[in-house]
Curated annotation (Swiss-Prot):
The gene is rpsT. NCBIfam families: S20. One of its GO terms (molecular function) is structural constituent of ribosome. Gene3D superfamilies: Ribosomal protein S20. This is Small ribosomal subunit protein bS20. Belongs to the bacterial ribosomal protein bS20 family. GO terms for cellular component: small ribosomal subunit. GO terms for biological process: translation. SUPFAM superfamilies: Ribosomal protein S20. The keyword rRNA-binding applies. Keywords: Ribonucleoprotein, Ribosomal protein, RNA-binding, rRNA-binding. InterPro entries: Ribosomal_bS20, Ribosomal_bS20_sf.
Length: 86
């Protein structure tokens, strides 16, 4: 158990950050899901628009430290390739 005031503060801060990061990650997943839904429907224009909206969200995840840059690069690459192949 945290005995020092600073350790207690870090626990509070970590809980807040975990909630914020979870919300950010959920938002990113939603944008990616929109692209995948459009791809499953076979609608190229909708998929391209959804991808255009998802890319800045993914990049923001890297900037905020929620996702690793290589993970985002891989996701963007795969989604872009799938949209282009429609």
């Amino acid at each position: 158990m945290a005995n020092t005031p600073q350790a207690r503060k870090r626990i509070r801060r970590n809980e807040r950050r975990a909630e914020i990061n979870g919300n950010r990650l959920s938002r990113i997943r939603t944008f990616v899901k929109k692209v995948e839904t459009a791809l499953a429907g076979g609608d190229k224009t909708a998929a391209a628009e959804a991808l255009k909206a998802a890319q800045p969200e993914l990049a923001r995840g890297v900037a905020r430290g929620v996702l690793h840059k290589n993970t985002v690069a891989r996701k963007m690459s795969r989604l872009t390739k799938r949209v282009a192949s429609l």
